[in-house]
């Protein structure tokens, strides 16, 4: 089930969807070379490169163990694979697993629970509702933030840096993202 969710996520999340041409579960992948031995999904990047994906659905309280990624690292080292993505429902990667990931010649990109939380998607409540998942509504600056943005924009025309002083909880970080 998690593999189907990951496929949906890669096709729906604005960051990933903008980089990906096509996503397949391993058993759908037209160029697969055997049974599922560690690669759960494959996608083609817009640059034409092929990526292998390992999806790990484990408790957020647990770490990914080396033994849980060994077959993925082995299978995805094939010359047909250009990139590797480890996507998991936890933020924890065990010490030995992290050491093996760090020593790989072919980079392994890790996308973990915290990145899911930061996604711009409203997640569906069940697997049956995947088709109804949608992007979160973009935040818009509030009146006090608009005022701060205008004042900072004016100030940096004559100075190379500045400072924003706003009360706690008024959205300083978000305001800073709107300053151009």
Predicted regions: what they are:
Residues 21-47:
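Active-site metal-binding core of divalent-cation-utilizing nuclease and nuclease-like domains
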Residues 40, 54, 145, 172:
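Acidic active-site catalytic centers that drive phospho-/nucleotidyl reactions
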Residues 2, 65-68:
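Helical mechanochemical/support elements of P-loop NTPase systems and associated helical scaffolds
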Residues 9, 15-18, 24, 31-32, ...:
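ATP-dependent helicase/translocase motor core
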Residues 1-7:
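Nuclease catalytic cores
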Residues 47, 55-66:
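Short beta-strand-loop-alpha-helix junction that forms the active-site gateway
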Residues 42-53, 79:
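Active-site beta-strand-loop-beta-strand hairpin of nuclease catalytic cores
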Residues 36-37, 68-70:
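Glycine-rich, highly charged phosphate/nucleotide-binding loops
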């Amino acid at each position: 089930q998690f593999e189907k969710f990951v496929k949906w996520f890669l096709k729906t999340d604005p960051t990933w969807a903008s980089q990906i041409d096509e996503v397949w579960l391993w058993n759908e992948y037209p160029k697969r070379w055997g049974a599922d031995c560690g690669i759960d999904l494959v996608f083609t990047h817009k640059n034409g490169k092929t990526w292998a994906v390992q999806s790990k659905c484990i408790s957020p309280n647990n770490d990914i163990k080396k033994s849980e990624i060994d077959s993925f690292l082995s299978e995805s080292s094939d010359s047909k694979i250009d990139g590797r993505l480890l996507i998991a429902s936890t933020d924890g990667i065990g010490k030995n697993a992290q050491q093996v990931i760090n020593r790989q010649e072919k980079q392994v990109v890790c996308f973990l629970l915290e990145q899911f939380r930061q996604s711009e998607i409203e997640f569906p409540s069940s697997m049956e509702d995947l088709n109804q998942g949608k992007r979160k509504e973009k935040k818009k600056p509030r009146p006090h933030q608009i005022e701060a943005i205008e004042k900072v924009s004016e100030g940096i025309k004559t100075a190379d840096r500045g400072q924003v002083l706003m009360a706690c909880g008024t959205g300083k970080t978000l305001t800073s993202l709107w300053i151009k």
